[in-house]
Design a protein with these regions (language model features):
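Extracytoplasmic
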Residues: 1-260, 268-275, 279-400
C-alpha cells in the first residue's frame, strides 16, 4: 500500500459561476489567495485500476475557519470539508471507483464561512489517495514534469505519407475546427514542414489569427541572438499581415493575419516551397476562406538562408498553448490534402501516421485521440480529460 499525492499546481483548473471572476488562483505552489465563492477549482487524475481509495486534502496555510464543498460528480460524492488551524491534513473519507478513467474533483468555498475582510480560503496544496496498491494505477502530471506543458495538455500530430517525397513544391490542406471545439489557446496547424508551420489559432476571446512562421537555421530560443547571415528574410507579405520575430521554441520569422475564422467552416491552406539559386529556400503561405472568396490570399513569403530544399516532413498538429484552458477539449479535421512536385505533377497523399509530444509520451496526460472520418477527413483531438482511447503512437490512418 502507498499514498499518492496529486499536486494542485500541476493538475487543477478554475472555472467561474459568475460573469466576472478575473483572478487566477492556481500557482505551482497550489491554490492561493482564494476568496471568491463563485470560483470552482477542479483537479483531475486518471485511475487505471478500479478500487476503493481513502482521500484527504493537504493545506499548508489556513487563515481562519472555513468550509469547502468537495464533490466528485461521476461518483455522486459530496463532502463539506471544515477547516480550522488544526486541519492542514483533512480526511475526506473514501471513494469507490468501479471503472478506469479520468476523475474530476471539484472544490468550492461556501459563502457562509468566508468574508473578504477576514482572509482567504485555505491554501490547497495536494489531494492524497491512500491505500493504493500499485503506484502506477494513478496517472497525473508529476511535479518532476513541466507544469506549463502538463496543464496545457498533449499535442497531437498527423504525419503525411506521400507516394513520393521528391521535389514537393506545393501542398494544400483543408482544416475545420467543429463548432464548440474552438477554446482559447487552440492551434489547428494545417501545414507543418521541416522549416516552419502554418495554421489557425484562437488567441483570445476577441482575436483569431492565421499564422505562418519559418525557423532560422541557427538553433536558439532568443531571436535577438541570431547572426545576420542566419536571419530569415521577408520577401513579401499580404496587405494586412503582421510581421514579427519569434522565440522560445526555436527562433525565426513570424507572420500572421488577424482573421475572424469561424468554427464549423473548412478553410484552405496552401504552402509553396523551393530552393533558390542564391543559397536560400523560399517558402510562401496562402489562405482561402471559401465563404468569402474563390481566390487565395497571400499571408507571407520568407526566404531561409543556408537551405536548399523543397517541402519536406509534411505534417499537421493540434495543440493548446494556454495552460489555463487545458481542461477543455479541442478537435480539428484535416481533409482534401493535395501535393504537387516542381513539375506540377500531382503526388498522392497515401495516409497519415499518428504521433504526440512528451506530455503524452511520458503518460502525464492521456486525453488524446486521432483517426479518420471518411466524410470529414483525418481528425485530431486533445485536452479536456476525456477517457483514454485505443489510438497509439505510430498508428496509420487511411481514407477510403
Amino acid at each position: 500500500m502507498t499514498d499518492i499525492s496529486i499536486p494542485f499546481g500541476w493538475n487543477a483548473y478554475q472555472s467561474c459561476q459568475a460573469q466576472t471572476c478575473t483572478n487566477s488562483y492556481i500557482q505551482e505552489s497550489g491554490v492561493s489567495f482564494w476568496r471568491d465563492s463563485n470560483v470552482i477549482i477542479s483537479l483531475f487524475f486518471y485511475v487505471t485500476v478500479a478500487g476503493a481509495y481513502n482521500i484527504s486534502l493537504v493545506s499548508d496555510e489556513i487563515q481562519r475557519e472555513a468550509e469547502i464543498q468537495v464533490s466528485i460528480p461521476s461518483l455522486s460524492f459530496n463532502y463539506y470539508a471544515k477547516f480550522n488551524q488544526n486541519s492542514l491534513n483533512l480526511s475526506l473519507g473514501s471513494i469507490k471507483i468501479e471503472n478506469p478513467g479520468y476523475i474530476k474533483v471539484d472544490f468550492q468555498g461556501t459563502k457562509s464561512m468566508i468574508n473578504r475582510k477576514y482572509g482567504n480560503y485555505p491554501k490547497l496544496k495536494a489531494l492524497v489517495l491512500s491505500n493504493v496498491q500499485n503506484r502506477n494505477a494513478i496517472k497525473f502530471v508529476q511535479q518532476s514534469f513541466s507544469s506549463h506543458f502538463g496543464r496545457r495538455g498533449p499535442s497531437v500530430h498527423l504525419n503525411y505519407n506521400l507516394e513520393s517525397k521528391s521535389n514537393i513544391q506545393h501542398f494544400i490542406n483543408h482544416v475545420a475546427v467543429p463548432k464548440y471545439w474552438d477554446a482559447v489557446g487552440t492551434y489547428a496547424m494545417a501545414i507543418g514542414f521541416d522549416y516552419g508551420y502554418f495554421g489557425m489559432q484562437v488567441n483570445s476571446q476577441h482575436e483569431r489569427r492565421i499564422l505562418f512562421s519559418v525557423w532560422s537555421p541557427q538553433k536558439t530560443d532568443d531571436p535577438s541572438s541570431i547572426l545576420p547571415e542566419n536571419q530569415v528574410i521577408l520577401v513579401s507579405k499580404g496587405k494586412d499581415t503582421v510581421i514579427n520575430s519569434f522565440g522560445n521554441e526555436g527562433s525565426g520569422g513570424q507572420s500572421y493575419l488577424v482573421y475572424p475564422w469561424v468554427a464549423g467552416v473548412g478553410y484552405q491552406f496552401r504552402l509553396d516551397g523551393y530552393p533558390g539559386q542564391d543559397g536560400y529556400s523560399y517558402f510562401t503561405a496562402y489562405f482561402r476562406d471559401p465563404m468569402k472568396s474563390e481566390r487565395y490570399t497571400l499571408i507571407a513569403s520568407w526566404k531561409r538562408p543556408k537551405t536548399q530544399s523543397y517541402l519536406t516532413g509534411l505534417y499537421s498538429f493540434l495543440e493548446n498553448f494556454d495552460p489555463e484552458t487545458g481542461n477543455i477539449s479541442r478537435k480539428a479535421y484535416f481533409n482534401n490534402q493535395e501535393a504537387f512536385d516542381n513539375r506540377r505533377k500531382r503526388v498522392k497523399v497515401l495516409s497519415a501516421s499518428f504521433s504526440y509530444d512528451d506530455t503524452a509520451n511520458k503518460q502525464q496526460r492521456l486525453d488524446y485521440d486521432g483517426g479518420v472520418d471518411n466524410k470529414n477527413g483525418y481528425y485530431l483531438r486533445n485536452c479536456g480529460f476525456f477517457d483514454k482511447t485505443q489510438v497509439k503512437r505510430g498508428n496509420v490512418f487511411s481514407k477510403n
